[in-house]
Amino acid sequence: SVEKEYRLLYPLLKKRAAFLFEYGHILHKQQKPEESIRILMEAMKYSSDPMILNIIGKNHQQTGDYLAAERWLIRSTYRLPGRIYPYYLLAKLYAEPDFRQPDKLEEMKQIVLAKAPKIYSTAIEEMRREVKKIK
């Protein structure tokens, strides 16, 4: 498996931010949030990429630790305020049945819908379409 390959490469590449991010992201996609968090915490030593924070937040959301997810995602918005993606993730977090926060949800939806993107993409269109569906 891909995860096994990354595990074998880890001793050689454990100080490379891009490798650690990809490894952590793969673990996240494989529903292994605790392992993913551990690897991504290492990646933070070598990179200030806010995507690391976003994936850590998504991992905490997977485990049901919504307050930790919120903290990491808010931290991502501080790192690069111009990015729309962390606000989109916060909107989805605030829509979680066990963490529902209608006021914060509306605030994040408005940011996603109104914020001018630095670079327009189909991903932005998709996020905006999806956020409109969230009730």
Show the residue positions of the predicted features.
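Alpha-solenoid helical repeat scaffolds
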Residues: 18-22, 51-55, 85-89, 121-126
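Conserved structural position within tetratricopeptide repeats
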Residues: 11, 41-45, 74-78, 111-114
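TPR-repeat structural position
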Residues: 33, 66, 100-102
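Structural motif corresponding to the intra-repeat A-B loop/turn of tetratricopeptide repeats
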Residues: 30, 63, 97-99
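TPR/TPR-like (Sel1-like) alpha-helical repeat modules
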Residues: 78-79, 84, 91-120
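Short coil turns that delineate tetratricopeptide repeat
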Residues: 14, 47-48, 81, 117
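Single-residue signature of alpha-solenoid repeat helices
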Residues: 2, 36, 69, 104-105
